[in-house]
Amino acid sequence: MLREYKTVREIVGPLMLVEKVEGVKYNELVEIETGTGEIRRGQVLEVNGDKALVQLFEGSTGLNINDCKVRFVGKSIELGVSIDMLGRVFDGLGRPRDKGPMIIPEKRLDINGNPINPTARDYPSEFIQTGISAIDGLNTLVRGQKLPIFSGSGLPHAQLAAQIARQAKVLGSDSKFAVVFAAMGITFEEADYFISDFRRTGAIDRSVLFINLANDPAIERIATPRMALTCAEFLAYEKEMHVLVIMTDMTNYCEALREVSAARKEVPGRRGYPGYLYTDLATIYERAGRIKGRKGSITQIPILTMPEDDKTHPIPDLTGYITEGQIILSRDLYRKGIYPPIDVLPSLSRLKDKGIGQGKTREDHADLMNQLFASYARGKQAKELAVILGEAALSDTDKLYAKFADEFEARYVAQREDEDRSIEETLAIGWDLLTILPRAELKRVRDEYIDKYLPEKGE
């Protein structure tokens, strides 16, 4: 039997303190009935004796401590999941936002999930083709990996996220592929862009969207990624699908976490973020992976905007510790008109070696990748030298490397927003670029691969 309390002592920001409670549990779902009969939801953050601290998902605007009725439901927050969620748009708490009917759930799952037993985890493998050369060719995404994108304010990470969601696929697999898209704290224009882009391209049919707008309560953002991951776990482990989870913008999520921490008067950590930020982010990122004996998998691409483009900021810093690499967007490339402005040199996919090579992409992929990295790095050095000493100071070989760097950015990194390159096209562009350099400079590629794949100059 549900007990109803009218003993609300205090409301501060998104938090409510309820007194004289019994049998209340941490993370328990709470229903708050206002004086007008409106029902709002919350979650127990802390229990101390007969007092419970409740986090309000819809905010505290309009609440009066004298006429609130609080009910503790006896279970944690759950999401009703079903295969019918594919093709639908929900808000940050899993309620339909697309004016469609409510989902009839096949089952209800706790949004906090269950940790995967480390011994039951299967090592990430298998190449995921995103259709973007700078990722597929140089910083390969592998099924079961968590690979974040570090962006900056004003950079086209929204377009990149939509493009990956449209184009991503596992080659040669008979399992179905799905995309779960979680957006936190985005503007109405961004939400409209995502929804219309998914519908226009038909990507909506294999996608589930959870959208928390900037004018929605900030506290709702804490639940949004967990709603998305709960849906992803159902599709992956119950329906045997390969699921790609794209979460944007994790910076907004962390700001919401800081807001709740400040309201609780907790001792702040770096830059005012709570000391448990690392642990909290890990509860989200570590829900990616594969399980032995299961066909399905969850691959994550969290996207975050680095405040002031600072890689040492706590959010990108801690994210980098938990995840398996990072894709970094460059403001300099963006100013040159290059899309996507992926800076390939500081970017890294730690598991790329597990998803490339014979039987996965192509035998020459690893050698070609190493040669492109080395040549582009030397080309950038040559261009920097030319700025200081003048182009006349460069050797003929350095001039070729400088030309290679420009061509690499213009032809390999840059591509249209609607351009879906196969891995064969990406590798072909890479080999074509290497014709700019003398064969003697191709020291990182085996001779048999050069003979087999390097086109003749002038072809």
Curated annotation (Swiss-Prot):
InterPro entries according to UniProt: ATP-synt_VA_C, ATPase_a/bsu_AS, ATPase_F1/V1/A1_a/bsu_N, ATPase_F1/V1/A1_a/bsu_nucl-bd, P-loop_NTPase, V-ATPase_su_B/beta
PANTHER family: V-TYPE PROTON ATPASE SUBUNIT B
Protein name as catalogued: V-type ATP synthase beta chain
Source species of the chain: Thermoanaerobacter pseudethanolicus (strain ATCC 33223 / 39E)
One GO molecular-function entry: ATP binding
Record has Ubl conjugation as a keyword: no
GO BP annotation list: proton motive force-driven plasma membrane ATP synthesis
Purpose: Produces ATP from ADP in the presence of a proton gradient across the membrane. The V-type beta chain is a regulatory subunit.
Keywords recorded for this protein, A-Z: ATP synthesis, Hydrogen ion transport, Ion transport, Transport
Family: Belongs to the ATPase alpha/beta chains family.
Short name of any one Pfam family annotated for the protein: ATP-synt_ab_N
UniProt keyword Ion transport present: yes
